[in-house]
A protein has these predicted regions:
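A short acidic (Asp/Glu
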Residues: 38-41, 97-104, 126-130
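Carboxylate/His-rich catalytic cores and anion/metal-binding grooves
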Residues: 15-35
């Protein structure tokens, strides 16, 4: 609702969102929160950070890891509350590939229209050697993610000749499924 009707949304923004023609030109730049609730063996790690309105409304029924991720809640909320929009974000690939995000992929069914990858250490204060994906989603098209071909960029910004095929692995076994039966808990190794 707009502020003039007791809501939190500025009236001008509300008018744009509710007008189909104006909404086509709307671009919202938001830095989604990247935090995850949980605990470690030694200490609590941001316990309760996931307790949001969207968590209670949508993710409370799920029993997966994805509901602990604020960026997943953020994407789901945009998808549900601002229909028929384009969403762009950057993150790791876990929302596409992780078995923990299969429940999220059931809810968030915007078509992944385009993705490109860059090394994580391209960003300030990131030391890891893993890809960061720049995603463009189209919520006009209801489609569960299964796979896509991504362009790959090097740290210097040059496009690599390599392209990467990214899967959701919904039907396949993960490496842990293969390793778990051979794991020896007494000596903590395979």
């Amino acid at each position: 609702l707009p502020k003039s009707k007791g809501g939190k949304l500025p009236d001008d923004l509300y008018n744009i969102i509710t007008d189909e023609e104006k909404r086509k030109k709307l671009v919202v730049y938001i830095n989604p929160p990247y935090a995850e609730s949980g605990s470690t063996k030694k200490r609590d790690a941001k316990v309760g950070v996931n307790e949001s309105m969207i968590h209670k409304r949508i993710f409370s029924k799920l029993s997966s890891y994805s509901k602990r991720e604020l960026f997943a809640q953020f994407l789901a909320r945009i998808y549900i509350e601002i229909p028929n929009c384009k969403i762009a974000n950057f993150s790791t690939l876990k929302n596409l590939q992780s078995s923990y995000f299969s429940d999220f992929r059931e809810i968030f069914r915007a078509k992944l229209a385009k993705i490109f990858l860059a090394p994580a250490d391209t960003f300030d204060n990131v030391k890891g050697k893993f890809p960061i994906g720049f995603f463009v989603w189209d919520s006009n098209i209801n489609e569960k993610f299964h796979e896509i071909i991504a362009d790959v960029y090097e740290k210097d910004g040059e496009e690599s000749i390599e392209r990467k095929r990214i899967f959701s692995y919904e039907e396949g076994k993960y490496i842990n499924d293969w390793l778990r039966p051979t794991w020896n808990k007494n000596i903590n190794e395979i």
